[in-house]
Amino acid sequence: MKKHHVDVLISENDVHARIAELGAQITKFYQEKQIDNLVVVGLLRGSFMFMADIVRQINLPVEIEFMTTSSYGTGMTTNHDVRITKDLDGDIKGKHVLIVEDIIDTGYTLEKVRDILNLREPASLTICTLLDKPSRREVEVPVEWVGFEIPDEFVVGYGIDYAQRHRNLGYIGKVVLEE
């Protein structure tokens, strides 16, 4: 790991306020469709804090599932080798599925997860991400709910790591490399 420090990009208060808004929007969306079998799938490890907070803001009965994906390794750039290292425990056939992601960068991870889950015949599949870096997108994936659009910075905090560090920060910070 290179010598660095972390500057605040999005404050803890702003993160929590936006999650409350997203939860209300998601609740309204599914209530209007009279959906009562929502499965929320968190993509680990980065989404664990966001997942815990967003499901508490969704005012509907939900089932919780997790998948673990990997595409970063221990560096600061993503690669196209997306691996599923932990799959869902339950069946999603005929159920409405909401994928919860920490950050969308190139789009490859979400494309692979979405394709895998669609093969399992859910009734619907939607996506909510805390952070979106549209300037880095290489694969377009439809995303229904975005917390924050951010510039092309390497970010940490609120579950997101740099070489397994900084996940515990309550805010979103940008990594600044030091000379």
Curated annotation (Swiss-Prot):
Q: Where does IMP bind?
A: E101, D105, T106, G107, Y108, T109, L110, K133
Q: Spell out the subcellular localization from the entry.
A: Cytoplasm
UniProt-recorded Gene Ontology molecular function terms: guanine phosphoribosyltransferase activity; hypoxanthine phosphoribosyltransferase activity; magnesium ion binding; nucleotide binding
Q: Which CDD domains match?
A: PRTases_typeI
Identify which top EC class this enzyme belongs to: transferase
Q: Which keywords does UniProt give here?
A: Cytoplasm, Glycosyltransferase, Magnesium, Metal-binding, Nucleotide-binding, Purine salvage, Transferase
Q: Which NCBIfam families does this chain map to?
A: HGPRTase
- What species is this protein from? Haemophilus influenzae (strain ATCC 51907 / DSM 11121 / KW20 / Rd)
User: Which SUPFAM superfamilies does the record associate with it?
Assistant: PRTase-like
E.C. number(s) listed in UniProt: 2.4.2.8
- InterPro entries in the record: HGPRT, Hxn_phspho_trans, PRibTrfase_dom, PRTase-like
Gene expressing this chain: hpt
Binding of GMP occurs at: E101, D105, T106, G107, Y108, T109, L110, K133, D161
Q: Which reaction equation describes what this protein catalyses?
A: IMP + diphosphate = hypoxanthine + 5-phospho-alpha-D-ribose 1-diphosphate; GMP + diphosphate = guanine + 5-phospho-alpha-D-ribose 1-diphosphate
- Protein name stated in the entry: Hypoxanthine phosphoribosyltransferase
Positions annotated to bind diphosphate: R45, G46, R167
What's one GO-annotated cellular component?
cytosol
